[in-house]
């Protein structure tokens, strides 16, 4: 929760108070990355369970999840007071380095085996989703540390910024 408090304090240092409507508007104009809609739809058409596991905020992730019509999603969240203003607290549902716990729970809740799980992520923190028996695809890493971590982990990496390029690696 500390990282969320820190982010909220940085925002409030620039502007306070911040109303939830402002945050909704800020996230309303998001665009999907190239190939996201097509890749997810292809997986859903094949009967694949698709979930978004993000250490981002629920306002953003819920919008993306809705646009893509995924089966499930989880993200951290904001807390607003009774008048709709952002408080200093956040809701921490998962840590960036603890996504593997979420993957394990999703697999158990939905009756899936790790051997049938493929996680896709763009940073070294996402490697935590590579639970035992599963597969992982590095996707368009931007930081050198992520590129190095993916190479050390021996996972395939898609360098194009088009999610469809990950489909052939999913098997």
Regions found by a protein language model. Give the residues of each.
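Conserved Lys-Pro-Asp/Glu-containing loop-to-beta segment of HAD-superfamily phosphomonoesterases
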Residues: 97-129
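Short, charged, surface-exposed secondary-structure boundary motifs
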Residues: 81-88, 145-155, 167-170
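Acidic, Mg2+-coordinating phosphoryl-transfer loop and its flanking beta/alpha structural elements
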Residues: 54-55, 116-159
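Short, acidic/turn-prone active-site loops that include or flank metal/cofactor-
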Residues: 75-81, 141-145, 161-165
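A metal-dependent, Asp-based hydrolase signature
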Residues: 1-44, 49
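Histidine/lysine/aspartate-rich catalytic loop segments that bind and position anionic ligands
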Residues: 65-96
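Substrate-recognition element of Asp-dependent hydrolases with the DxDx(T/V) motif
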Residues: 36-68, 72-77
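Conserved beta-strand/loop elements of the cytosolic catalytic core of P-type E1-E2 ATPases, chiefly
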Residues: 25-37, 52-55, 75, 91-97
């Amino acid at each position: 929760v500390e990282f969320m408090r820190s982010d909220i304090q940085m925002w409030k240092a620039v502007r306070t108070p911040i109303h939830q409507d402002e945050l909704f508007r800020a996230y309303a104009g998001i665009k999907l990355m190239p190939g996201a809609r097509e890749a997810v739809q292809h997986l859903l058409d094949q009967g694949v369970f698709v979930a978004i596991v993000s250490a981002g905020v629920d306002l953003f992730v819920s919008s993306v999840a809705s646009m893509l019509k995924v089966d499930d999603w989880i993200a951290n969240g904001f807390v607003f007071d009774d008048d709709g203003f952002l408080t200093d607290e956040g809701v921490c549902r998962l840590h960036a380095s603890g996504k593997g716990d979420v993957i394990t729970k999703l697999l158990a809740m939905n009756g899936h085996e790790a051997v049938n799980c493929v996680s896709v992520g763009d940073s070294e923190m996402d490697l935590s989703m590579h639970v035992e028996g599963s597969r992982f695809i590095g996707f368009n890493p931007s930081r050198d540390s992520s590129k190095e971590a993916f190479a050390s982990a021996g996972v395939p990496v898609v360098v194009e910024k088009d999610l469809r390029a990950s489909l052939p690696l999913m098997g």
